[in-house]
From Swiss-Prot:
GO terms for biological process: RNA modification. It comes from the Eukaryota. Coiled coil: none annotated. This is Pentatricopeptide repeat-containing protein At4g20770. The lineage of its organism: Eukaryota, Viridiplantae, Streptophyta, Embryophyta, Tracheophyta. It holds the Pfam family PPR_2.
Length: 774
């Protein structure tokens, strides 16, 4: 009778649990206590189930504590409840106190650790489980693989894959999807994930979504599109997460193959239409993804239309719009959206303010950037970094350093980004003392061997011509340096005219086989080849460029063109230039300059006219290049016509360099009076360089009278310059007026004016050396 009564009570408790009738359950609880049935573990487990289902933790705890005998079910039930409510501390306490555990116990503990963000601890618990002789279930592996995904531990994930194969769980859709997600996030979707997908008998929307996301992360554009197409053909339901993943491949990203440009914004628009057709028009996450795609593809008009039609927006939506307009140099729109955001009741977060700051500085609106920064109550280090980066990128280096000092007064500790920005500013200003102070700060911190910091320090000392210090810093950290530091050191050698050392260091880097040269490495070392006029080395590096896949990089293309031009291989330069698919203004300028440098002025002018007819807009450097070519080839009238067209047709105001070219052109042609008139009529008549050019022409044509007049003007403009004395002395010497030349040398000594020694390069076989001559 007693046993039958217990079964009846247990049945009632199950019914009350299913219906969540806690009050009725408490009545039964009271009856059990009065009848002395608390020792019945089975009944107590039913009470525990009731209170857990009703979410009454206090009574569940009371029942659990008062149980005289607890079995594995009791422990698991209470552990499951503590895990469900997220009470990690008590869950660990219950788990550690369990006299015996089963797979459910381990699964609960691993699951709660993963959910609460303790993935590493979850993996440790899993290892303990295996050591205790328990075989993982599908729930175990799913949780452990989720932990591997979050900590990006693909190696441990592969071990779990092996366990799944041995236990036959790899074909289970639950485990299979977890494997796909892990491989996708760890970057192994192509190597291993696709095989897992193919082994699943009936992949579902989660399977397809994971594979598409992984392929998108690895920039496998075509494969991702094909997988999405297969998903649609199989009739698998497409959800908003899948659409977000496929959308991500239509955004331009570094390292993405050319197919991303083919699909690009067009694919984004197609997915947008599909999302509307499938009824996801109100999905906030998907709409934010769409906004981001339009913004990244520089279609802010389209993004603004989507934003206006969104039924719901959040801070992320506003931030995407603000960043997008900033990338397009439209700070006015960024500020407008910030104002609208506040008016709509949204509180801008730090990301918002930093985004607006970036937009303002990117657009050159420094004053608005200052106001936005001043409106931040307590700027964080990230906000200061955005401000300092803005000043530095806009070439306001002094203000960057000044604001850095203000930041220090706020008792904020600069991070590696802060110090990198300030080191860059010090390098640009050649502010050695400031660089040394930052160096001291770096030595006292744990970031002394951070690659960005090391690169910045090398740049500072190189710009300040302290190459011995740069080399010490480089050698001290050589085993921990990345490509940026090597590039900085190579660039330092090039900047200090140590081009041979630049070539040697590049070879050393290439021979290590640890780091591969990038486009910056090649552009820098090719520049050194240009200055050394070393065609042999230049061709070797050209071969490496092709082998490394950087031949279509715009900087490398320009450097190669320049190298061939400087080495006198003008036809090779033109052949390479013609093969360039996307010519920008810089490479046009380089080729025009190359023709001029090699005395082929007619071809330089012809290429200039071809540039104009192609629709490429010339800049100031274009005109310097073509006017120089006119000067060296005696194309006086053509040069004057091109100078006249600068302002009249192209809207470019001639600067000093342009007038120098024309004065030189007129002077070379013997039209010295015209050259003098032009020099007097320019806004730069107080520039000594302009008159030095004219004085040099006087020597060539033997015009002593004009030479004296110009030399006197030069001496007034720059009394300590040796140019006037040397050029006038050379004029006297060319006309055999030795007494006048000697008198001028005496005057030069009397006034303590010294001539700067020249430098020349000497080639010994394949090696290069430099020497000085006076």
């Amino acid at each position: 009778m007693r046993s039958g009564g217990n079964k009846y009570l247990a049945s009632l408790l199950r019914c009350y649990r299913d219906e969540r009738c806690k009050l009725s359950g408490k009545v039964i609880h009271g009856f059990i206590v009065r009848m002395g049935m608390k020792s019945d573990t089975y009944l107590c487990n039913r009470l525990l189930d009731l209170y857990i289902e009703c979410g009454d933790g206090d009574y569940a705890r009371k029942v659990f504590d008062e149980m005289s005998v607890r079995d594995v079910y009791s422990w698991n039930a209470f552990l499951t409840f503590r895990c469900k409510v997220g009470d990690l501390g008590e869950a660990c306490e219950v788990f550690d106190g369990m006299p015996e555990r089963d797979v459910v116990s381990w699964n609960n503990m691993i699951s709660v650790l993963v959910r609460k963000g303790f993935e590493e601890k979850a993996l440790v618990v899993y290892k303990r489980m295996v050591c205790d002789g328990f075989l993982p279930s599908r729930f175990t592996l799913a949780s452990v693989l989720s932990a591997c995904s979050k900590v990006l531990d693909g190696v441990f994930g592969m071990r779990c894959h092996g366990v799944a194969v041995k236990t036959g769980l790899d074909k289970n859709i639950f485990v299979g999807n977890a494997l796909l997600s892990m491989y996708a996030k760890c970057g192994f979707i192509v190597d291993y994930g696709v095989r897992v997908f193919e082994s699943l008998s009936q992949p579902n929307e989660v399977s397809y979504t994971a594979v598409i996301g992984g392929l998108a992360r690895e920039n496998k554009v075509l494969e991702a599109v094909q997988m999405f197409r297969l998903m649609c053909e199989k009739g698998v339901q497409v959800d908003s997460v899948c659409l977000s993943n496929i959308l991500s491949i239509s955004a331009p990203r570094e390292g993405c193959d050319s197919l991303s440009e083919i699909y690009g914004n067009e694919l984004g628009k197609q997915i947008h239409c599909l999302a509307l057709r499938l009824g996801f028009g109100g999905d906030l996450h998907l709409n934010n993804s769409l906004l981001e795609i339009y913004a990244k593809n520089k279609d802010m008009n389209g993004a603004e239309l989507i934003f206006a039609e969104m039924p719901e927006v959040n801070v992320v939506s506003w931030n995407i719009m603000i960043v997008g307009f900033g990338q397009e140099y439209r700070s006015d729109k960024s500020v407008e959206f910030l104002t609208r955001m506040r008016d709509s009741g949204f509180q801008p977060n730090e990301v918002t303010c930093i985004s607006v700051l970036g937009a303002c500085f990117r657009s050159g609106d420094v004053e608005t950037g200052r106001r936005i920064f001043s409106s931040i109550p307590q700027p964080s280090v990230s906000a200061w970094n955005a401000m300092l980066s803005g000043y530095s990128n806009y070439e306001h280096y002094e203000e960057a350093i000044s604001n850095f000092r203000q930041m220090q007064f706020q008792n904020l500790k600069p991070d590696k980004t802060t110090l990198s920005v300030i080191l860059s500013s010090c390098a640009r200003l050649r502010f050695l003392e400031g660089g040394k102070q930052i160096h001291g700060v770096v030595i006292r911190t744990e970031i002394s061997k951070n690659s960005h910091i090391v690169s910045g320090l090398i740049a500072v000392y190189s710009e300040c011509e302290k190459m011995e210090i740069s080399e010490c810093i480089f050698d001290d950290c050589i085993n921990e340096l990345d490509i940026a530091c090597w590039n900085s050191m190579i660039s330092g050698f090039r900047h200090n005219m140590l081009d041979t050392k630049a070539l040697i260091l590049f070879r050393r880097m290439h021979q290590t086989a640890v780091l591969c040269p990038n486009e910056t490495s090649f552009a820098t070392v090719l520049s050194s080849c240009s200055r050394l006029c070393s065609l042999l080395h230049g061709r070797q590096f050209h071969g490496l460029v092709v082998k490394s896949g950087y031949v279509s990089d715009s900087f490398v293309e320009t450097a190669l063109t320049d190298m061939y031009c400087k080495c006198g291989e003008i036809d090779s330069a033109r052949q390479f230039f013609d093969a360039v698919l996307r010519k920008n203004t810089v490479i046009w300028n380089e080729m025009i300059h190359g023709y001029g440098h090699n005395g082929r002025g007619d071809e330089a002018v012809g290429l200039y006219r071809k540039m104009i007819s192609s629709g490429e807009k010339p800049d100031g450097i274009t005109f310097v290049s073509v006017l120089t070519a006119c000067s060296h080839s005696g194309l006086v009238e053509t040069g004057l016509e091109i100078l006249s067209s600068m302002q009249r047709i192209h809207g470019i105001e001639p600067e000093l360099d342009h007038y120098i070219c024309i004065v030189d052109c007129l002077g070379r042609a013997g039209r010295l009076e015209d050259a003098e008139k032009l020099a007097e009529a320019t806004p730069y008549k107080s520039s000594s360089v302009l008159w030095e050019i004219l004085l040099s022409s006087c020597r060539v044509h033997g015009d002593v009278s004009l030479a004296r007049r110009v030399a006197e003007k030069l001496m007034r403009l720059d009394p300590q310059s040796s140019a006037a004395y040397v050029l006038l002395s050379n004029t006297y010497s060319s006309l055999r007026q030795w007494d006048d030349s000697a008198a001028l040398q005496g005057l030069m000594n009397k006034n303590r004016v010294h001539k700067t020694p020249g430098q020349s390069w000497t080639t010994y076989g394949n090696d290069l050396d430099s020497g000085f001559r006076k």
